[in-house]
Swiss-Prot record:
Location of the protein in the cell: Nucleus
Identification of the protein by name: Homeobox-leucine zipper protein ATHB-40
Coiled coil (UniProt feature): none
Family: Belongs to the HD-ZIP homeobox family. Class I subfamily.
Keywords: DNA-binding, Homeobox, Nucleus, Stress response, Transcription, Transcription regulation
Residues within the DNA-binding region(s): 52-111
Matches recorded under SMART domains: HOX
The gene coding this protein: ATHB-40
Species the sequence originates in: Arabidopsis thaliana (Mouse-ear cress)
Keyword DNA-binding part of the UniProt annotation: yes
PANTHER family on file: HOMEOBOX-LEUCINE ZIPPER PROTEIN, HOMEOBOX-LEUCINE ZIPPER PROTEIN ATHB-40
Region described as Disordered: 28-52
Keyword Aminoacyl-tRNA synthetase: no
Function: Probable transcription factor.
Length: 216
């Protein structure tokens, strides 16, 4: 029987490396592709960290309500509590942990949105108050300016009226020209006005006509 070079080489290789020979595809043979095993959708590692797989079950309304009630009591999930909830709901502990993790993330996002809305409303109110106060300041400045102009106008009117009044001018002139004691001067010893009085003898009777004649 005649062998080709390839057949001789293959026979030689099979004797030296039997394990390698089994992996070499013979001429004319078709290598069947290996089928990859599909992973179950939604499957994750078991809670104890082993290689076991579980199918993620869709939660019922009752299970969701019980999880929501438990989350309302305490946002953090401890190991004992996780196992107890999983046993009560008939779920895998890992699925309960994932649900709590997602629910806590939504709760934090909601809190951030609420805080943001509160701060935004406070900021808007402060801006409105600021605009209102600025408007009041402008109005008060205008009123102050008008009041200052009115005070200045009244002051100018009073000054102009007092300087041009004829009554005040005549009174001031007469007061300067008329002495307080007339043409008589009053000395310190009183001698200057002794001639205005006439001595009257004691025990003498002077009638009214004679008394008046002394000063006429």
């Amino acid at each position: 029987m005649n062998y080709t070079v390839d057949d001789q080489n293959m026979a030689f290789i099979s004797q030296l490396y039997p394990d390698v020979y089994t992996q070499i595809v013979q001429p004319g043979e078709v290598k069947q592709p290996k089928r990859r095993r599909k992973k179950t959708k939604g499957s994750v590692a078991s809670a104890d960290g082993g290689n076991g797989l579980f199918r993620k079950r869709k939660l019922t309304d009752e299970q969701v309500n019980m999880l929501e009630m438990s989350f309302g009591d305490e946002h953090k999930l401890e190991s004992e509590r996780k196992d107890r909830l999983a046993a009560e709901l008939g779920l895998d502990p890992r699925q309960v942990a994932v649900w709590f993790q997602n629910r806590r993330a939504r709760w934090k996002n909601k809190r951030l949105e609420e805080e943001y809305n509160k701060l935004k409303n406070s900021h808007d109110n402060v801006v409105v108050d600021k605009c209102r106060l600025e408007s009041e300041v402008i109005q008060l400045k205008e009123q102050l300016y008008d009041a200052e102009r009115e005070i200045q106008r009244l002051a100018e009117r009073v000054e102009g009226g007092s300087s041009n009044s004829p009554i005040s001018s005549s009174v001031s002139v007469e007061a300067n020209e008329t002495p307080f004691f007339g043409d008589y001067k009053v000395g310190d010893d009183g001698d200057d006005y002794d001639h205005l009085f006439y001595p009257v003898p004691e025990n003498s009777y002077i009638d009214e006509a004679e008394w008046m004649s002394l000063y006429i």
